[in-house]
Amino acid sequence: MLYDIIKSLRKILLLTLIYVFFASFAFSEEIEKDNIFLIDDAPFDVHKSKIEEIQKSKTEYDSYGFRLKESITSTLPSDEECINHKRPVYLLDTATTRYFEKGPLDSFHTGFFYKGSLPISMIQGGVTHTDYTQNNIENHFRGYLKNGKTSFNISTRYTPRKDLDFFQFLIGDLFVSHQLTQHNRIVFGNSRTHTGEEGSKPDWQVPLISYSQISRNFGNIRKFGARVVGEYDLVEYDFGGYSSDSYFREFFPRVEFTGWVNFKPLGKTNGKYGDLKIGGGISSGHNNFTYNVAGAYARYQYKKFRADFEFANADGYNGNLGLSKKHARGLYTTVYYRITPKVELLARYDFFQPDLDVSKKDIKEYVVGLNYYLKGQGLRFMLNYIFRQSDFGNDSHRIILGTQIML
C-alpha cells in the first residue's frame, strides 16, 4: 500500500513539473512585454497617462538579465532634454519619480543637488593655498497635483553656516504654486525674492561658480510670503509681499515688498533678431531699520552669442549675507559664447563699492570661465579664473575647478 501511495505522489509531482515547465513558456513572453519595470518586484501605482509612455520608451531585455549600457541610457535624460540650460535636469528623475493612479497627487519627484569647488588662491606678496568648498548639498522634493495647475516644492540644505544654526539653514524652498491663468501663477511660502535678476536665480542656474558681488550681497535670499508671477511674449513680472525675516530667525518682524518687471521688445519676432530683455525693480522693507535696493538689467542673445548687464544701488539691504545699513553700489557685465551645444566660454567684469558712506573704495573682479555641460545642468564641469583687485587689501588670483551634479 505504501508503495502505491509513493507511486501516486511521484505521478502528481511529475505532472506538476510538466505543467510549470510548459506554463513558463506560455506566459514568459507576455510577462516580458507587459512588465514596464523589467524586474520582478511589485510595481508602484503608476498614473495611467504615463504607462503608455514608459512602455514605448522601455528597453527590451533578454532572459539573462539587465544590459548595463541600455539600462543607463534608458534612465538618463536624452541630449535633447538637456539643451535648455534654464531648466533643471535631474539625471535619475525617471527612477526616483513615483506616479499615482489614485488620490489628488499625480507625481512626486525626489532629487539631489551638489555643487562643489576646488579653489587655488594666490595672493600677491602672500601665500598660495588650496581648499575644498562644498557650495551646496541639497535634497529637492517636487509634487504635482492632477489638476495640472498646482505644485509644491521643498528643498533641504546640509552645508552649515557659522552665523546660523543647523535648523535655520536646513529649509530652503517651502512653497506651493498655483497656475491662475495661462500666463499667471501665485506662489505662497518660503521662496526666492526677485531682488536683482541674477540674485533671483537658483545656484544651479548661475553661469559661473559664484554669484556676482551685488547678487551675493543684495540678493540670493528666500523669504516667507506671497508672489504673483506673470510671463507674456512682451513682458514678464514678479511682485511679492514677504516677511522681512530670513532663515526663520524671527516671526514676521516687519514687511518687505519686492517687484521686478522685464520688457521683451523682440518677443513677437520668433527669435529672428535675437532675444532682448530690459528691466528693473525694487526691494524695500523694514527690519529694525528701513532698507531699499533698486536695480536695472539688460540682456541680448543672438544664436551662440549672449551678453548681459546689471546695476544695483542699495541704501541698506537684506540679502544672503544678512542685514546691513550700508550704502552700497555695484554692477557686472558678462559676455557668453556657446562654442558647441555642450561647451560655453564666458567673461565677466564685476565692480562693487561696499560702503559709500565711508569711502568710494571698490572691489573689482575680472572673471574668465569655461562650462562643459555633459548632461545639461544635471552634470556640469566648470573652470573659472578670477583676478581680484581690492582697495581694501592685496590683489589676488584664483583658479577654481567646479562640479555640479543633479540626481
PLM feature spans:
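Detector for outer-membrane/organellar transmembrane beta-barrel domains
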Residues: G103-S107, Y144-T150, W260-D355
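Bacterial N-terminal signal peptides
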Residues: L15-S24
